[in-house]
Amino acid sequence: MFAIIETGGKQYKVQQGDVLKVEKLEANPGDVVEIDRVFAVSKDGELKVGAPTVEGAKVLLKVEDHGKGKKIIIFKYKPKKNYRRKQGHRQAFTQVRVEAIQA
């Protein structure tokens, strides 16, 4: 059984027990978050596709941890003008585990 969900403006294909990193959620570690933006659910070989979402379907995610991703460097410069700007960024994420898919 799998589902396609949306959280943080991105879509994920999830199964029960999967661990994934999503955009930061406002929840504490140990909390259970309910996602109702479910676009498709497959159960026993039968695929239900929503228009745009599947009615009554939801996915329960358990928050395990919060963190920051790998640092990326933004470097801007203009040749011959002595203009240089260096900036770093680390994207915040939430690590979640899929507890249940309810369809």
From Swiss-Prot:
UniProt function note: This protein binds to 23S rRNA in the presence of protein L20.
Name the record gives this protein: Large ribosomal subunit protein bL21
Mitochondrion found in the keyword field: no
PANTHER family: 50S RIBOSOMAL PROTEIN L21, LARGE RIBOSOMAL SUBUNIT PROTEIN BL21M
Quaternary assembly: Part of the 50S ribosomal subunit. Contacts protein L20.
Keyword field: Ribonucleoprotein, Ribosomal protein, RNA-binding, rRNA-binding
Species of provenance: Heliobacterium modesticaldum (strain ATCC 51547 / Ice1)
One GO CC term, this protein: ribosome
Disulphide-bonded residues: none
Family: Belongs to the bacterial ribosomal protein bL21 family.
Top-rank taxon: Bacteria
Residues annotated as transmembrane: none
Gene Ontology BP terms: translation
Alphabetized GO MF terms: rRNA binding; structural constituent of ribosome
